[in-house]
Amino acid sequence: MVDKDRAATIRIGDEEYDLILTTKATKEIAGRYGGLENLGEKLLKAENFEMALGEIVWLITVLANQSILIFNLRNKDNPKELLTEEEVELLTNPLDLAEYKVAITDALFKGTKRNIESEADSKNAKVE
């Protein structure tokens, strides 16, 4: 369904979901936190446990829905329903959410990594 180099997979209930950082997700995160660079700080500084859980649930929902949105874009005749925050809350437990933090970090890393390739003929090659 999705390029696995871009995704981190989690299980919610009986379903697997790919967490993907797309441009759309980045815009949503920026709107909520002011940018990706502020995300970790905001999650760590959540005023209370309930608020921290709510932020993690929101983030999982946003990232998991990216793979569904991509699927729906490619399969307009057979779209899947988007995951809701309520579904994430009901189908997970706090231990799951702690484990998902690793997947969230992985998805964010994969979404922001840069592939740097060296040219075969370097401009700074030794001249003979």
Model region roles, listed by residue range:
Residues 55-66, 106-109:
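Short, hydrophobic/amphipathic alpha-helical patches that form generic packing surfaces
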Residues 22:
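Residue-level signal for threonine
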